[in-house]
Regions:
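Conserved catalytic core of nucleotide polymerization and phosphodiester-bond processing enzymes
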Residues: 172
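Well-ordered mid-protein domain cores that form the structural environment of catalytic cofactors
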Residues: 1-7
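Conserved polymerase palm-domain catalytic core
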Residues: 7-145, 149-165, 209
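Right-hand nucleic-acid polymerase module
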Residues: 37, 86-112, 121-124, 128, ...
C-alpha cells in the first residue's frame, strides 16, 4: 500500500501451468493434511471420482442436441439447465471417454467444485516451503491459483537468480506444474522506482515494462490502478452492447424490447449493487449482485489513497457521448 522507499525490494511474479498433476502426490498431500496413513472411505470416494473421470467431446454433445458446431451452438448448449439426465447417460455410454492419462495416474478435470480445493491441497508442501524461505528473508509470499508473487526486501541483484531458482524448485518438485519463463517477471524496486530486470535472471527473456501487474491490478511504484487490459475490456464490451441495442432498433430476435437502461445497468454506477440496493430498500425491490463499480469501490476502500480509479469519473459522459453518436447515425 505504501511507496517502496525504505529499502531495495525484489519482486518475483510467476505464472504456472498445470499439465498433469500426479495422483499419488495429491493423495499423499491429502493424507498429510488429515494426518492419516490412508484416506478415509468418504475422502477416497471423492478422490476416486475426480481422478477416474470420464468426459464427452463438445462436438458430440452438439450433435446429440442437433446444434451447430460453432459459438452460437455452444451458447445454446450452455443455456440448458442440465445437459444429460441419468437415463440418457447410461444409454449414451459409448460417447464418453476415460481420462486419457489414467495409465500414468495423472490429471484432474478443471471446473468441478472440488477441483480448486484439490489444487490448493496439491500445493500445500510447496506453499509451506516457499513461505518459510521467504519469511526467513523477512519477505512476503502470495499465491492465487497458479499465479505466484514473492517480495524480498533488502535484496541484492546478485542474489536474484538464486531466489528465483530456489522458488521454482519448490514449485516444480511436486510435478505437473510448469513455470512459464515468458510469463515470469522480476523487478527491482527502490525509492518508488520500478525496474524490470528479468533479462538479468533469465537470459532468453527481454526486459518488459517497468510496471508490476498482478491479479488485475498494476503498480507503477506510486499508484495502483486496474490493468489496462481490464479497462479496455470494459469499454469494448460497453461499445458492443450499445451497437447491439441500436443495430436491432431496440428489439431482440425473440421480440423482447431493450433500451439504453440495459447499458447503464451493466456498464455504469447505476447498475452497482450499492446504487441498486439503495433503490431497492426504498422501493421494496429485490437486491442485485452489482457490476464493475462495486469492485472499484471495494478496491478504493481496501487499497486506500494509492488506488487510482480512472473509469468512474468519466464513464457516464463517455456512455452518453457514445449513445448520442449512435442515435444520430441511426436516425440518418
Amino acid at each position: 500500500r505504501n511507496r517502496c522507499s525504505i529499502s531495495p525490494v525484489e519482486v518475483i511474479l510467476l505464472s504456472g501451468v498445470r499439465n498433469n498433476i500426479s495422483h499419488s502426490y495429491l493423495k499423499k498431500q491429502l493424507c498429510d493434511l488429515l494426518n492419516v496413513e490412508c484416506l478415509p472411505p468418504d475422502y477416497y470416494a471423492i478422490f476416486k471420482s475426480v481422478t477416474r473421470f470420464s468426459y464427452a467431446e463438445m462436438n458430440d454433445l452438439l450433435d446429440y442436441y442437433k446444434l451447430e458446431k460453432n459459438k452460437n451452438g455452444q451458447k445454446q448448449l450452455n443455456q440448458r439447465g442440465k445437459l444429460l439426465d441419468t437415463k440418457t447417460i447410461r444409454a449414451w455410454k459409448k460417447v464418453f471417454k476415460k481420462n486419457p492419462n489414467l495409465p500414468e495416474a495423472e490429471g484432474v478435470p478443471q471446473g468441478s467444485p472440488i477441483s480448486a480445493v484439490l489444487a490448493n491441497v496439491y500445493m500445500l508442501k510447496a506453499d509451506k516451503q516457499i513461505y518459510e524461505y521467504v519469511s526467513a528473508l523477512q519477505g512476503f509470499y502470495m499465491r492465487y491459483s497458479d499465479d505466484f508473487m514473492v517480495v524480498i526486501p533488502n535484496a541484492a541483484p546478485v542474489d536474484f537468480r538464486k531466489h528465483y531458482e530456489t522458488i521454482c524448485g519448490f514449485i516444480t518438485e511436486a510435478g505437473g506444474i510448469e513455470i512459464k519463463a515468458e510469463k515470469t517477471r522480476i523487478f527491482f524496486v527502490e525509492n518508488g522506482v520500478i525496474r524490470n530486470c528479468i533479462a538479468d535472471v533469465i537470459f532468453s527473456q527481454e526486459n518488459g515494462k517497468d510496471l508490476i501487474d498482478f491479479l488485475g491490478f498494476s503498480f507503477d511504484g506510486k499508484e495502483i490502478r486496474l490493468r489496462e487490459k481490464t479497462i479496455s475490456k470494459y469499454y469494448n464490451r460497453m461499445h458492443r452492447k450499445a451497437v447491439t441495442i441500436f443495430k436491432c432498433s431496440g428489439v431482440t430476435k425473440k421480440g423482447n424490447r431493450i433500451n439504453a437502461n440495459e447499458l447503464y445497468k451493466k456498464y455504469s454506477y447505476k447498475g452497482s449493487a450499492a446504487y441498486q440496493n439503495r433503490k431497492a430498500a426504498i422501493n421494496g425491490g429485490k437486491h442485485i449482485e452489482g457490476n464493475l463499480f462495486d469492485y472499484l469501490k471495494a478496491s478504493k476502500r481496501i487499497i486506500g489513497d494509492n488506488f487510482v480509479d480512472s473509469i468512474t469519473p468519466r464513464h457516464m459522459a463517455r456512455i452518453r457521448r457514445f449513445i448520442n453518436g449512435k442515435q444520430g447515425k441511426h436516425h440518418k
